[in-house]
Amino acid sequence: MPAADTNDPEPQNAARVLMVRPASFGWNPQTAASNAFQSASGESARTLQQSAVLSEFDALADALQRAGVEVLIAADSPEPPKPDAIFPNNWVSFHHDGTVALYPLLAPNRRCERREEIIEQVVREGSFRVSRLVDLSHREAEQKYLEGTGSLVLDRAHRVAYACPSPRTDLDVLGEFAQQLDYELMTFEALDGAQRAVYHTNVVMAIGAGFAVVCGDSIVNAEHRAAVFAKLRATGHNIVDISLRQMGDFAGNVLELAPEKGNLIALSTTALQSLTPTQRRLLESHADLVAVSIPNIEHFGGGGVRCMLAEIHLPKRARVPGSRAALGALKSPVS
């Protein structure tokens, strides 16, 4: 295991997130085949109003900021067009030991989302320290992919990475991630109601400090399902077991954050409205629910609120450095 920058336990929840404000959001034909949550092509996609998407984006950023979350907003570049740039958690993750991890993406038109200037902006504006780059993007040459915290649901506090194999989540790359960042793996097959592989683990489940949301019905192997539930209980998580319908409404695509004002769970209005009163009460016993309506992003992009947020766990520096000095440990962080 590579040496870490700190031996302190990693907190589960971040107080800071990266969001990327899109310039060319839209239905992406290169991702549609592997994402059953992504809907609408043709005329309906062509009539999508960018202003509606930007309003949804701004509403989420504003709601999080009002709740005390530090939101670092990067601007998507107009060229080349990047229809999924609003989902930065698929290409980058930031860790408490100073590690920045970059990930291989299935769709060729998503790979230009990995932009060094975004990482530099995060480090500069947040006054963060970066000590190591783990760049897995070279695995794209082998047609092997691992799409960040879309493919991975991380129990950071207990060093367990949950993942369901799919065209976007390769077991070999998963093993490399686990070795580089010192995670135990819990893998399982997950299918939607039409018996298709679920594209990303983070629509199947979410993990907070003391709870986990899981679609048990999607984990088709009974032994795998029992193992996942047993591991979650052993690590102190109260389980909210959602249905396949609720999974389709992004009820598993939620994220707990920990600003100074108190913990919150970010989710979409669609997800919130799908919860039963009992499920909602259980979640509210752990954190406040912050729900925002993002119907266009969910419908055309096939991702929910959690997909729009890349948590920032990087350690702070004593002073604000220049971008290049702060990123001195990074070697060619984009492909």
Show which residues each predicted segment covers.
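The feature marks the mature, well-folded catalytic cores of soluble enzymes
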Residues: 1-335
